[in-house]
Amino acid sequence: MDKNYLYAVANIRANELSLLSRADIDALIDAPDYKTALTLLDGKGYDTSFGSDYSAMLDGETEKTWSLIKSVAPSAEALDIFIVKNDFQNLKAVLKSEKTGDDAEKYLVSPSVIPKELLLKAVKERDFDSLPDFISDAAKKCLEVITKTENGQLCDIAADRACLEAMSGFAKSADNDICLLYTSDAADEL
């Protein structure tokens, strides 16, 4: 086995110790109040400085975990297939928020292949060519759909279809049976 893979597996296995166990989850459920739950999470290494904004805490932990995985993965680009759905979710959120006048940032999810700032700027400036190839044409089409029809569901359909096509493209590029199977399962979910 390649040394890079051995290192990656060993690093991830070592970090598994900080994951919540069944007993930890039970303790969180049984916690008498929010402060006690935060203390339990703090003991497991979670950043509890967000106070009552548990969503921000979970987002931070997700980003931290994803950064760790990408940093040790011998081929980090191969992992993009697992998060590209978030990019299309973010595209839908930005386009719909623009239509409703709402703040899109509160609807953006992570991790994502495309930095959130780039997506927000591209939509605002209608500079979809600045986006990666896997989403630039879809962004144009989704904007056209939502502008002409003012129907968010039709925009969702266009984005979801483009997402499946992008995932399929990532899977074919990876030339990996697991990625192909994942794409097939994801198509069943959408």
Residue ranges and their predicted role:
Residues 103-105:
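Short helix/loop capping segments that flank catalytic or ligand/cofactor-binding pockets
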Residues 81, 107-109:
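Long, charged all-alpha helical bundle/coiled-coil segments in cytosolic proteins
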Residues 182-190:
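Single conserved hydrophobic/aromatic residue that forms the stacking wall/gate
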Residues 1-75, 86, 111-150, 154-176, ...:
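Conserved hydrophobic core element of enzyme catalytic domains
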Residues 84-85, 184:
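Low-complexity, polar/charged sequence tracts that form flexible coils or short amphipathic helices
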Residues 88-101:
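Extracellular/lumenal glycan-associated surfaces
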Residues 82-83, 95:
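Long, low-complexity, acidic Ser/Pro- and Gly-enriched intrinsically disordered regions
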